Amino acid sequence: MVYIMEIYTDGGCRGNGRPGAIGAAAAVVVKRNGKSTSWTRSLPRYPPPTNQRAEITAICLALELALEKFDQLDTNPQFDVTIYSDSKYAIGCMTTWIYKWARNGWFNAAGNQIANRDLIQEASDLDDRLDEVGNVKYVWIPREKNEVADRLCNEDMDDQ
């Protein structure tokens, strides 16, 4: 039996990278019947939130939700997770750059330490854990296909 999870993610920030900035991440799990369940997470004030930190936080949230779901299952099915994001940065981090950065000691091609290393390493660790129990795929989608997660981020930031 195959258990399939589809999770739409988004992150947003107001005041990107400046003192007083606020940020939020959202993950929306879409079920086979078309219904969805959603979660949001406000970003901490330090380090100052950025759009990129919010997008990677959303990926971490999705990976955490997938691992929690797997732990709740009574059986050990083949577990296939697809994480959708409208962030080319987040998708690039998880599908390409993360492997190069890890090999280079978390430095980029210019020899500088990569930005958001803490969150990217956290996402990498969660991805590794999920790979032990199933498959995870990251898919870029256009912004207009991600309206629910985007709205949830904005609502979270409105409440901060």
Where are these regions (language model features)?
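RNase H-like nuclease fold core
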Residues: M1-R53, E64-D71, D156-D159
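RNase H catalytic domain
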Residues: N16, L61-C153
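Short secondary-structure junctions and interdomain/linker hinges
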Residues: L130, D159-Q160
